[in-house]
């Protein structure tokens, strides 16, 4: 399966294929001339696949070094980025060379940020290995690192030269890590694809883990939602905000819990349920939709709430949300399954929203 992210200034393809990782050398050769490559990966993914990937790239004529960092959201910071910049410089990476992000969402965000800022920007590729990264963060060009104040506070919009998705690598994920990625899949269904919602209704996490043909289809449909929105609004000023359904409260939960304690897809699930509950009470979403969303997230092993629910800490995190404009936060609601809408909320109203 192939999708084309047809951006006027930087079009690229997303390849989705079981077993695609075994052909990585040919894929990279089709996009880049023989050059130096820095493979950026965390210790877990690098331990599983790194040596084979490097061997294939070297066999195809590339000179490769690997920058490895400790697994987890806590590594997505300026210190790790600086270490990566220095690593690239010591290897002699120039603007005609490239970086490959090989790992989950943390790796993709970090490596993309490093590539977009090293020497004011060099080429990079995305090879996502988590479900969250495959269906969401690897497409669209958002890169970033966290600060103490907020998730992804420092970042750029920089598109990759290509994305290679191999669903088979998901077999090495634990059940929590796999289900976490389904938070973003459910979000895609809610904002833009009712047929995907119906498919998720008919399946279960067990079905998906046992049938990778179904996983390939679900990844494709989710990526198509992301592709359409990105092509229409590359810089996140309009319809691309729809992709943030559940993220306003979700990012606040991640921040207050401490990065990594609540996984991103889990936080999105919590955020979708909580914002829907508020919007339903205010008549902005239809009666009963919150229960439908809650039922779906719980069916796929995701949380619908977070404790302790500290309104003051959550509100403080929300004030640093990237969707804030002055004292207004642009939240996303779902008027019906398969559609989305922007709802502007003041900070004061948001305080009320957070009260239980």
Swiss-Prot record:
Cofactor note as given: Binds 1 divalent metal cation per subunit. Can use either Co(2+) or Zn(2+).
GO BP field: amino acid biosynthetic process; aromatic amino acid family biosynthetic process; chorismate biosynthetic process
UniProt GO molecular function: 3-dehydroquinate synthase activity; metal ion binding; nucleotide binding
Gene Ontology CC: cytoplasm
Source species, domain of life: Bacteria
Catalyzed reaction equations: 7-phospho-2-dehydro-3-deoxy-D-arabino-heptonate = 3-dehydroquinate + phosphate
Documented EC number(s): 4.2.3.4
Names of the cofactor(s): Co(2+); Zn(2+); NAD(+)
List of residues binding NAD(+): 71-76, 105-109, 129-130, 142, 151
Residues that, per the record, bind Zn(2+): 184, 247, 264
Swiss-Prot/TrEMBL keywords: Amino-acid biosynthesis, Aromatic amino acid biosynthesis, Cobalt, Cytoplasm, Lyase, Metal-binding, NAD, Nucleotide-binding, Zinc
SUPFAM superfamilies per UniProt: Dehydroquinate synthase-like
Pathway membership, UniProt: Metabolic intermediate biosynthesis; chorismate biosynthesis; chorismate from D-erythrose 4-phosphate and phosphoenolpyruvate: step 2/7
Localization annotation: Cytoplasm
CDD domains given in the database record: DHQS
UniProt xrefs under NCBIfam families: aroB (TIGR01357)
Summary of the function given for this chain in its UniProt record: Catalyzes the conversion of 3-deoxy-D-arabino-heptulosonate 7-phosphate (DAHP) to dehydroquinate (DHQ).
PANTHER family: 3-DEHYDROQUINATE SYNTHASE, 3-DEHYDROQUINATE SYNTHASE, CHLOROPLASTIC
Family note: Belongs to the sugar phosphate cyclases superfamily. Dehydroquinate synthase family.
Protein name, as recorded: 3-dehydroquinate synthase
Organism: Lactococcus lactis subsp. cremoris (strain SK11)
Gene: aroB
């Amino acid at each position: 399966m192939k999708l084309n992210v047809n951006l006027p200034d930087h079009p690229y393809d997303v390849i989705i294929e079981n077993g695609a990782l075994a052909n990585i050398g040919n894929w990279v050769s089709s996009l880049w001339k023989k050059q130096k490559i820095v493979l950026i990966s965390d210790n877990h993914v690098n331990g599983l696949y790194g040596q084979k990937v490097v061997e294939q790239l070297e066999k195809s004529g590339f000179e490769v070094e690997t920058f490895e960092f400790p697994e987890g959201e806590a590594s997505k910071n300026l210190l790790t980025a600086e270490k990566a910049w220095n690593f690239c410089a010591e290897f002699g990476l120039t603007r005609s060379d490239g970086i490959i992000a090989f790992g989950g969402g943390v790796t993709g965000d970090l490596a993309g940020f490093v590539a977009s800022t090293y020497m004011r920007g060099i080429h990079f590729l995305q090879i996502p290995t988590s479900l969250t990264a495959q269906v969401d963060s690897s497409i669209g060009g958002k890169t970033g690192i966290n600060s103490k104040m907020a998730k992804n506070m420092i970042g750029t919009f920089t598109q990759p030269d290509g994305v290679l998705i191999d669903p088979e690598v998901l077999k090495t994920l634990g059940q929590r890590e796999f289900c976490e990625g389904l938070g973003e899949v459910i979000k895609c269904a809610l904002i833009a694809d009712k047929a995907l919602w119906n498919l998720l209704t008919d399946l279960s996490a067990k079905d998906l883990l046992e049938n990778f043909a179904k996983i390939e289809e679900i990844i494709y449909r989710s990526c198509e939602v992301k592709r359409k929105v990105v092509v229409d609004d590359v810089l996140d000023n309009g319809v691309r905000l729809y992709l943030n359904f559940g993220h306003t409260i979700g990012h606040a939960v991640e921040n207050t819990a401490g990065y990594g304690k609540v996984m991103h897809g889990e936080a999105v699930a919590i955020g979708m349920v909580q914002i829907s509950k508020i919007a339903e009470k205010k008549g902005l979403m239809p009666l009963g939709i919150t229960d439908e969303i809650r039922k779906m997230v719980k069916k796929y092993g995701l949380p619908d709430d977070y404790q302790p629910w500290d309104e003051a800490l959550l509100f403080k995190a929300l004030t640093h949300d990237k969707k804030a404009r002055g004292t207004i936060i642009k939240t996303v609601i779902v008027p019906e399954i398969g559609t989305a809408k922007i709802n502007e909320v003041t900070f004061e109203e948001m305080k009320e929203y957070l009260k239980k």
